[in-house]
From Swiss-Prot:
Pfam families: HGTP_anticodon, tRNA-synt_2b, tRNA_edit
Catalytic activity: tRNA(Pro) + L-proline + ATP = L-prolyl-tRNA(Pro) + AMP + diphosphate
Subcellular location: Cytoplasm
Entry-linked NCBIfam families: PRK09194.1 (NF006625), proS_fam_II (TIGR00409)
Recorded domain comment: Consists of three domains: the N-terminal catalytic domain, the editing domain and the C-terminal anticodon-binding domain.
Entry GO terms, CC: cytosol
Protein name: Proline--tRNA ligase
Length: 581
């Protein structure tokens, strides 16, 4: 490819509304252009990288035995109504009516459609296992699309769905997809972690996220440097930081804390460690009658140490909270505690509440907590002596850096990550809802055991840039760069020798299967270099009259601090050996 044939449209500055590095650089590099909130044109430079990501995914999915198909972007409501998700999906699913007043939606995902395929086409256990995948446009009407392609409304996704005759066989399909995803992200050249993830309302214990490591990532990834343990912050188990409860050594005292309503302020006022305080969080659950009217509300008091944070996902797994909870209203808090938030605690309640203590809180002694009176806290509080034991002790907090690893092999560390892939064991959730069955070996109908496996194709571009960039621009891994090599001839229109050597190098690289672009725009060297550093091409070769007189060209890798001189005769073998080892 020659630059004059291609479409190069770089910007010196990013638009003012660009928020994150990847969004700014993709716009400046001429990869994307915004059409509407969360919707982008992918220009030729960006599409080249997308196609390379898709090709790697396609090769590894095929290698794993998955079969490619395409399902419609526009899907009828009837299938979604079978699973109940037509109403549950909320406004994120864009719905519309056709000219016949029939309801349709733009697909945010395709479990219903693929399950319909299976129930129509897979009649016998002899046809199993099967794994279908597509690389297709999705649309989710995000409330606040942001961060460019990282959280767009229209995006490209690879979604795969496995169908098996047993849970054991489904586990094998899951493992095969996990291995395929690992190969995909290895080939993409990204630093990533596969972490255990929460399974949400579906249940089960098979779910992993593939997270690209980046300081700007939205997700917290917990791992142990001394073992293979890794989980996202929602799932990572928090052990008690106190092996056992010490005996009481201080009397209970109602202590004035005027205007100090946070654990940090109370600890500073009293001159005690923040880890000696207890934080109170009040939740409520509602019982409804058949008409949906609330007939009873139950108030819950959850206690975590003052330097810890409540993990709402873990709280949602507690019996009684599984069906859903909310934070209590101020009226409910006044009714049960007799005071406003900021001074709440488990001692001297106005009305009974269910008390759940985090594992660490349950082992605390002589702790500080709210006194259920404005401007007062208790000091020297102890379980059993000053207040009843909690109704339940559970892991309800987020882990923090330095916590003991649940596998007992060291301490936990935390990184930031960007989720780009997810593998999930579904079980029979969809096959039962849609009565999708096959005839098993005994001749009886049986529901398919399913798994689903997603990769955000366009999101990978943003994640790769967030991980790989500098002040000059993008630093693409070679496997997904729009071009692997750029040849920059200095004096293209003026020197026949430069044109000849540039063309010879170009021809040699093309013959070796290298994706190379020859910059024949006749720009000044500084302009060419700035463009290609911004775009992020991994390898640059500069050919000029001065170097040719000495028989050398200038080579610079995108990550190299300085250029090096390489003999003209050696430059093609040098590049080919690096790119096609």
């Amino acid at each position: 490819m020659r630059a004059r044939q291609f479409f190069i449209s770089t910007l010196k500055e990013a638009p003012a509304d660009a928020e994150v590095v990847s969004q700014k650089l993709m716009l400046r590099a001429g990869m994307i252009r915004k059409v509407a909130a969360g919707i982008y044109n992918y220009l030729p430079m960006g599409l080249k990288s997308i196609r390379k990501v898709e090709n790697i995914i396609r090769e590894e999915m095929n290698r794993a035995g998955a079969l490619e198909l395409t399902m419609p972007l526009v899907q009828p409501s009837e299938l979604w109504q079978e699973t109940g998700r037509w109403d549950k999906m909320g406004p994120e699913m864009l719905r519309f009516k056709d000219r016949h007043e029939r309801d349709f939606a733009l697909q945010p995902t395709s479990e219903e459609v693929v399950t319909d395929i299976a129930r129509q086409e897979l009649k016998s256990y002899r046809q199993l296992p099967k794994n279908f995948y597509q690389i297709q446009t999705k649309f989710r009407d995000e409330r606040r699309p942001r961060f460019g392609v990282m959280r767009g409304r229209e995006f490209t996704m690879k979604d795969a769905y496995s169908f098996d005759r047993s849970a054991e066989a489904a586990g094998e399909s899951y493992d095969a997809m996990y291995a395929a995803y690992s190969r995909i992200f290895d080939r993409l050249g990204l630093t990533y972690r596969a972490v255990a993830a929460d399974t949400g309302a579906i249940g089960g214990d098979r779910s992993h996220e593939f997270q690209v490591i980046a300081d700007t990532g939205e997700d917290a990834i917990v791992y142990c440097p001394d073992s293979s343990y890794a989980a996202n912050i929602e799932l990572a188990e928090a052990l008690s930081l106190l092996p056992a409860r010490a005996g009481a050594s201080a009397p209970l005292a109602k202590t004035p804390t005027p205007g100090k309503s946070t654990c940090e302020d109370v600890a500073a006022l009293l001159g005690v460690p923040l880890a000696s305080t207890v934080k109170s969080l009040v939740l409520a659950t509602d019982d409804e009658d058949e008409s949906g009217k609330v007939v009873k509300s139950t108030v819950w008091l959850l206690l975590v140490r003052g330097d810890h944070e409540l993990n709402e996902v873990k709280a949602g797994k507690i019996e009684g909270l599984k069906a859903g909870f909310r934070f209590a209203t101020e009226a409910e808090i006044l009714d049960h505690f007799g005071c406003k938030p900021g001074y709440l605690g488990p001692i001297g309640l106005a009305q009974p509440v269910k008390v759940i203590a985090d594992r660490t809180v349950a082992n605390m002694a002589d702790f500080v907590c709210g006194a259920n009176a404005e401007d007062f806290h208790y000091t020297g509080a102890n379980w059993g002596r000053d207040l009843p034991e909690p109704d339940l002790v559970a892991d309800i907090r987020n882990v923090v850096e330095g916590d003991p690893s649940p596998d007992g092999k060291g301490k936990l560390a935390i990184q930031r990550g960007i989720e780009v892939g997810h593998v999930f064991y579904l079980g029979t959730k969809y096959s039962k809802a849609m009565n999708a069955t096959f005839l098993d070996v005994d001749g009886k109908p049986k529901h398919f055991e399913m798994g689903c496996y997603g990769i955000g194709v366009t999101r990978i571009l943003g994640a790769a840039i967030e991980q790989n960039h500098d002040e000059r621009g993008i630093i693409w891994p070679a496997s997904i760069a729009p071009f692997e090599v750029v040849i920059c001839p200095v004096g293209w229109s003026k020197s026949e020798a430069v044109r000849d050597e540039a063309q010879k190098l170009y021809d040699a690289l093309v013959a070796a299967g290298v994706d190379v672009i020859l910059d024949d725009r006749d720009e000044r060297p500084g302009v060419m270099f700035a463009d290609w550093e911004l775009i992020g091409v991994p390898h640059r070769v500069t050919i000029g009259d001065r170097g040719l007189k000495e028989g050398v060209a200038e080579y610079q890798g995108r990550r190299d601090p300085e250029a090096s001189r390489v003999a003209v005769a050696e430059i093609a073998p040098h590049l080919i050996s690096r790119l096609r080892p």
